[in-house]
UniProtKB/Swiss-Prot annotation:
Catalyzes the deimination of arginine residues of proteins. InterPro entries: Cupredoxin (IPR008972), PAD (IPR004303), PAD_C (IPR013530), PAD_central_sf (IPR036556), PAD_N (IPR013732), PAD_N_sf (IPR038685), Prot_Arg_deaminase_cen_dom (IPR013733). It catalyses: L-arginyl-[protein] + H2O = L-citrullyl-[protein] + NH4(+). Belongs to the protein arginine deiminase family. It comes from Mus musculus (Mouse). Ca(2+) 2 binds at D155, D157, D178, K363. This is Protein-arginine deiminase type-1.
Amino acid sequence: MASPRAVQLSLRKPTHAVCVVGVETLVNVYSDVPKGAKTFGVSGSSEVKIYMVYDPSRVAEPAGWAHWPLDANVDVVVVADTVSKDLYDFKVKVSYFESQEAAALAHSVLYLTAVDVSLDVDTGRTGKVKKGSGDKKTWRWGPGGSGAILLVNCDRDIHGSREDLHANHLKSLEDLQDMSPMVLSCGGPDELFESHKLVLKASLSDSRRLKVFCARGGTSLSNYKQVLGPRHSSYEVERHSGERAIQFYVEGLAFPDASFSGLLSLSVSLVDTRPLSEVSVFTDSVTFRVAPWIMTPNTQPPLELYVCSVTDIHGRNDKFLEDMSHLATKANCKLVVCPRAENRNDRWIQDELEFGYIDAPHKSFPVVFDSPRNRGLRDFALKRILGPDFGYVTREIEFAGASGLDSFGNLDVSPPVRVGNTDYPLGRILIGGSFPKPSGRRMARVVRDFLQAQQVQSPVELYSDWLSVGHVDEFLSFVPTSDQKGFRLLLASPSACLQLFQEKKEEGYGEAEQFDGLKHKAKRSINDILADKHLRRDSAHVQKCIDWNREVLKRELGLSESDIVDIPQLFFLKGAYAEAFFPDMVNMVVLGKYLGIPKPFGPLINGRCCLEEKVRSLLEPLGLRCVFIDDFLFYHQLLGEIHCGTNVRRKPFTFKWWNSVP
């Protein structure tokens, strides 16, 4: 806590000073003491509270009208509890005595003008500004925490423009809802502000990451003036006669990142302009934290399902779009089809973007994270998704192109988990990389740094560089369940698939064929698959890679074996990297209890696909509904599946991120 401002007294003439309502002022009774004085007494106006600060081990509080000793280091602190009506209308008098019974040797007089200067924000996180609510300079996490929250104003309230944060003037009154309110109290005699000014400031680094707009009433956009921002780090406040409070609105310009913690501070100073060198009388400060970008896991209810309309040598993917429409209808989810004119025949919408959201007590809205992949869908998020109350953020890779691991099929998030004594109420981000290999492909540092800096979904890096495409969604998924755990982790499992095929062989179905029903793929019997030494060798290698991730996931997400479901799946090696042997079933789209699963075209046993039946037996007892969809020609043959070719915007968490403790 800062020391109170000190005022020096004089026996020769009255002292005049300015104080702030509710703020302590130290009156220095030792600066000019009459000769022979040994004690002193203090009196003052009724509007001024007088406090004596002393060490009880050195001096006792005098009784009645007795005086205080001058040799006991007793401090006098005064606090005005109301605003002055006129200049210097409050009085404090200090009288000095030689003894308790003697008349006063001399008097010092202090005349005070009390002003109300306070910078206030929503430190209580209620959505409303409350004056003088606790420590405004310190931002604290947790349910009992405090501190204001700032949204990055990354949506677009006016069609045809860029994100609102790029504008130097207010473009719509609706845009104020995306900003955090801030109130400057400035009550006091108008005459005082002829010799004093109020200065609103941010540091140079902070001013590059926020903007402040001053509101002057009315409904015209011209009533809102930008006063702080990248070009202006200080602003001399224009206080009107009789004005007691001024409304401001603050917007964020940047998300937390490697070089930015997310904390931003603003201060207001009452400055005395009479001296040759201006003197600050009082400063009040507030601190904001920029709201992080938050991902939503498969366990959150779906709101919109995105899919692309494309054409290739097999024609148009109309049947797949129809299947997606039926699935979305079952899940009561809106279907959004991105036309070919907007996707440039790029079908991999999962790789292009990731839906998340930002949240503050006064406002929340979805924000799409556009990957640095920049292929046919590169303009879709910016041109078609960005809009009113729908934000946009991206990260670009400088001096190099994006690798396959920079696509957002390589970005996922777990449901909420508890690991030991640590809670992750918003889950943990999962990305794929090359570890434990000494070298290989990794997600670009600029993306990893961004994800890490959000703090509330502490990322875990998995091993995905064993795959040709290299994405985590090729070997894992999460599904919601209605039991106490609330979810299961699905892992692709070559061992489970080979075991299933062995069981079917022993039951007498060894001649049943994989890829039955496909015109464009040679069939292979169960016997042939089980006898394929190369496929078995590849399966053993892939299983080791998945098992390595299994242990990491168990450790980092606090999972037990009962939380994991092994989904039968075979892979083969092409060079040093693995690809799915048949449509990869864990690469599914999850819409509540409805799962859109790539149809595996497995061996038919009594007219039913044994792979589908196995997956149903694993998942449907958990309350899930398996819908198998043919994606073979348009997706699987191009090394992707349903999850790669779809994207889902989900309902935000009800849990408030500021109640977490990273």
